[in-house]
């Protein structure tokens, strides 16, 4: 099982406290796959919604593949369906309702030639939590420098 990282949402770990992660497949078209292989994709502005017990990713930007003839209506930031088991979707839905959590995309990667998206149940950090994270990171860097 080889995993090849395509893109990572770096701001997710800074803006959110990650509670649990899930691996989901994505419904894509042929030209979108080729564009993703060229790393012409961004998940920084993307978010995940659950509608009628189906899960979707919105605002994931997949640039148009330059050598493909495009179908009308195929937008770069269109809504794409995520593939998860019904039990997982229901479990996620229950946790969101109980604990006031959000679903965010963490990373996009290839696993055995299939594009997978790692999504996470997360809780938003407050401003003082972000400051604590920055201070903690700075002290760790300083200790490493002093250690060397």
Swiss-Prot record:
Known role: Required for rescue of stalled ribosomes mediated by trans-translation. Binds to transfer-messenger RNA (tmRNA), required for stable association of tmRNA with ribosomes. tmRNA and SmpB together mimic tRNA shape, replacing the anticodon stem-loop with SmpB. tmRNA is encoded by the ssrA gene; the 2 termini fold to resemble tRNA(Ala) and it encodes a 'tag peptide', a short internal open reading frame. During trans-translation Ala-aminoacylated tmRNA acts like a tRNA, entering the A-site of stalled ribosomes, displacing the stalled mRNA.
Compartment annotation: Cytoplasm
HAMAP family named in the record: SmpB
Record's GO cellular component terms: cytosol
Protein family (similarity comment): Belongs to the SmpB family.
SUPFAM superfamilies membership: Small protein B (SmpB)
Keywords on record: Cytoplasm, RNA-binding
Protein name in the entry: SsrA-binding protein
Main location: cytoplasm
GO molecular function: RNA binding
UniProt keyword RNA-binding, yes or no: yes
GO biological process: trans-translation
Keyword Cytoplasm set for record: yes
Pfam assignment, any one: SmpB
């Amino acid at each position: 099982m080889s995993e090849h990282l395509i893109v990572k949402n770096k701001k997710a770990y800074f803006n959110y406290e990650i509670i649990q992660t899930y691996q989901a497949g994505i419904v894509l078209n042929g030209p979108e796959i080729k564009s993703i292989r060229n790393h012409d994709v961004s998940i920084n502005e993307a978010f995940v919604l659950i509608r009628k017990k189906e899960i979707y990713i919105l605002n994931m930007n997949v640039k148009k593949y330059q050598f493909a003839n495009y179908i009308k209506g195929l937008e770069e930031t269109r809504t794409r369906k995520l593939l998860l088991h019904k039990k997982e979707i229901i479990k996620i839905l229950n946790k969101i309702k109980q604990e006031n959590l959000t679903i965010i995309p963490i990373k996009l990667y290839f696993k055995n030639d299939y594009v997978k998206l790692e999504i996470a149940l997360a809780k938003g950090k407050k401003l003082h939590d972000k400051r604590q994270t920055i201070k903690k990171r700075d002290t760790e860097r300083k200790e490493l420098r002093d250690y060397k």
